[in-house]
C-alpha cells in the first residue's frame, strides 16, 4: 500500500526532474510556454533577485539560421534569464576569486517542436576541491533548484 501511495504522489507532481548530462539539471512540465516562463520570472523575482537580461535563444537561432545554412528549427520557444545573488555570489568569489566565471546564473525555459512538454534547465555547478567554494556552489545549486520548484 505504501508503494502504491508513493507512486500516486509521484504521478501527481506537476514537475519532474529528468536525467541529464553531468553539467545540466533538467526539468519538464506541462502547460503553455508563456505560463511557465512567467512563473519562472516571478520565482526569480520572488527571491528578491533582479533579472539582468533575458536572452531570446529561439528567436536568435531562427533569425541566424538562414545565414549559416541551417534549416532545422531547434526550439518553438526558448528564453534564458540571467541573474545573480549578491549574497551567494560574494560567498563564491570570496572562496575563489576565479569563480567569477560562474556568474551570472542562467535558467533556461523552452519548448521543442513536436513535444508538448515545457523544459526548464540550468547548469550544474562543477566539482571543486576547495571546501569553501564547494559550500558556496551547493548554495548556488540550492537557489537554482528552489527557483525552479517555486515556478512549478
Task: Please give the residue ranges for each predicted region.
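Sec-dependent signal peptide recognition
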Residues: 2-7
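C-terminal partner/receptor-binding element of secreted or periplasmic proteins
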Residues: 122-152
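Beta-strand/loop substructures that line and gate deep hydrophobic ligand-binding cavities in soluble
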Residues: 103-133
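Solvent-exposed, acidic/flexible segments
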Residues: 29-37, 54, 74, 130-133, ...
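Hydrophobic h-region of N-terminal signal peptides that target proteins for export
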Residues: 11-18
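Compact, glycine-rich, soluble single-domain proteins
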Residues: 56-102
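Terminal, regulation- and interaction-focused segments at domain boundaries
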Residues: 19-48, 55
